[in-house]
Amino acid sequence: MGKIRKLDDQLSNLIAAGEVVERPASVVKELVENSIDANSTSIEIHLEEAGLSKIRIIDNGDGIAEEDCIVAFERHATSKIKDENDLFRIRTLGFRGEALPSIASVSELELITSTGDAPGTHLIIKGGDIIKQEKTASRKGTDITVQNLFFNTPARLKYMKTIHTELGNITDIVYRIAMSHPEVSLKLFHNEKKLLHTSGNGDVRQVLASIYSIQVAKKLVPIEAESLDFTIQGYVTLPEVTRASRNYMSTIVNGRYVRNFVLMKAIQQGYHTLLPVGRYPIGFLSIEMDPMLVDVNVHPAKLEVRFSKEQELLKLIEETLQAAFKKIQLIPDAGVTTKKKEKDESVQEQFQFEHAKPKEPSMPEIVLPTGMDEKQEEPQAVKQPTQLWQPPKQEWQPPQSLVREEQSWQPSTKPIIEEPIQEEKSWDSNEEGFELEELEEEVREIKEIEMNGNDLPPLYPIGQMHGTYIFAQNDKGLYMIDQHAAQERINYEYFRDKVGRVAQEVQELLVPYRIDLSLTEFLRVEEQLEELKKVGLFLEQFGHQSFIVRSHPTWFPKGQETEIIDEMMEQVVKLKKVDIKKLREEAAIMMSCKASIKANQYLTNDQIFALLEELRTTTNPYTCPHGRPILVHHSTYELEKMFKRVM
């Protein structure tokens, strides 16, 4: 008897379930996507114990006919495709015919469904075996319940995380689906507690507000672009609103949420130097294209895709974001809080006052520029009173119930936008008092960000504080400028242009620089020797696994030659290519930082005025090359609000 045998259907389904049904979030994703494919306009998701105990999905879709109910739970049975040509024209979220049999094989499943023009069907399946099938009275749509997930695969249960983590995975999936299909009303409940409710009115910004908070929605920049092959729509946050994880960037392709690193990278590149290192924007991009240009049949989970015109798409995304930011003044506002916020902060301040010891009063120095008095030759330090006590800052900790264990969340402790964002709201806005009707009204009242150009307005210097911060004014209010960041931006654009124009000339090193590599690294660098010569770097083999460098391109910053060479070697080893544009940009950043004025350096009034005027001539006067803000704005209204001139 031969050793090779055909597996029975039940065992095959258990094996397939290992790829399709990894955790409760996988079940929710597959069932909700089925509901959307069935033209549902309203979907309810009910969970118990993060789905490990019970998952129930109720929709008002087309339903399943009685004769199709049994077939639907057979492997590779689907209504979405008929022949191989349909694989290249997929518009539905599901098409493989694996989800239902895979889910049924590892759970106790109950299905009640009706097409509306005939009696409904009641089906009970346990571990892939049909226990009961009967007709029943039912409204149009489908009600499917999955209980005791992985009851017959205890090994899989060992790999489940805590209830809090599994619930976080589910909410993450539901949020992505809500963003990709704003025309569908979604309700999410956990242990009978409502976590999310979207209206289904098609307004993506309202969905984003219910997920990330109304404060984030006020800082969204609309993105639109169209080419022969692609149509892009969506929203991204202003550079002042960032997170410590890429998890807040969502990419949708033909209505399907996908995880694609290169798309996220393109969004980051669209911001370029507007983002600080290690910070990422909140973004939502919906991309429509011919199904022939995207392969969604890459993985059973259908979260990964491949593009046939990837470079064209990435370039379109980058250019669209860059063009959008060029139309906006990117000056962060200090902001005035709402009445509700003021009340909350006053209570918090009282609490902190009772538990904190007041600090000794301090008298910081504020330097007035000499240009304000022609007879003065040196800056004068003038003592100015400050508030006698400040409540200590408290670090915010995210609720563990809705945060992935694998991710680190480190929100900024500084109020960087108009209304300080309480990041816990991004996970449960409805609990924070946002009823759906109130949310709709608030979203309607959001003013579109003005697209009237990004030129920095004229600024008139007032003074300098601690030799580090410049105070300036105009008819819009008060501006605080970081003098080092301002000159760093000016110098960066100067060196960037200078380095970019340099010819391929080389300069000899006084002492040859030796590079020792592993065998794998040596072979990769050896493959790129000709490319390195084209950019002016000549390597000579020295020993078995080493090279020596006798000269370098003249555009290398003085004193940083070996750092740039090491950077080039690292690029070759990792990327198997030399990105000369990136190297030159990093060299320009290095040179600009070293050449800029530092903190505690006092300037005359003429020097301050010249610095501000030169800053206005740059292409991006809002952030330094590292992404830090250059200036912050206090509007006249905000100042009047502080001093109770307006109530």
Swiss-Prot record:
- List, alphabetically, the GO terms of the cellular component aspect: mismatch repair complex
The answer, when asked if Transmembrane is one of the entry's keywords, is: no
Mind telling me which InterPro entries this protein's record contains? DNA_mismatch_repair_CS (IPR014762), DNA_mismatch_repair_MutL (IPR020667), DNA_mismatch_S5_2-like (IPR013507), HATPase_C_sf (IPR036890), MutL/Mlh/PMS (IPR002099), MutL/Mlh/Pms-like (IPR038973), MutL_C (IPR014790), MutL_C_dimsub (IPR042120)
**Coiled-coil stretches:** none
For the keyword Chloroplast, the answer is no
Cross-referenced Pfam families:
DNA_mis_repair, HATPase_c_3, MutL_C
Question: Keywords of this protein's UniProt record, alphabetized?
Answer: DNA damage, DNA repair
Span list, region Disordered: 375-433
Query: What spans are recorded as compositionally biased (Low complexity)?
Result: 387-400
| Record GO terms (molecular function) | ATP binding; ATP hydrolysis activity; ATP-dependent DNA damage sensor activity; mismatched DNA binding
Q: SMART domains attached here?
A: DNA_mis_repair, MutL_C
Please cite one Gene Ontology biological process associated with this protein.
mismatch repair
Checking HAMAP family in the record gives: DNA_mis_repair
Query: Can you tell me which family this protein belongs to?
Result: Belongs to the DNA mismatch repair MutL/HexB family.
Please explain the role this protein plays, according to its UniProt record: This protein is involved in the repair of mismatches in DNA. It is required for dam-dependent methyl-directed DNA mismatch repair. May act as a 'molecular matchmaker', a protein that promotes the formation of a stable complex between two or more DNA-binding proteins in an ATP-dependent manner without itself being part of a final effector complex.
Q: This protein is called what?
A: DNA mismatch repair protein MutL
Q: What is the scientific name of the source organism?
A: Bacillus cereus (strain AH820)
Which gene does this sequence derive from? mutL
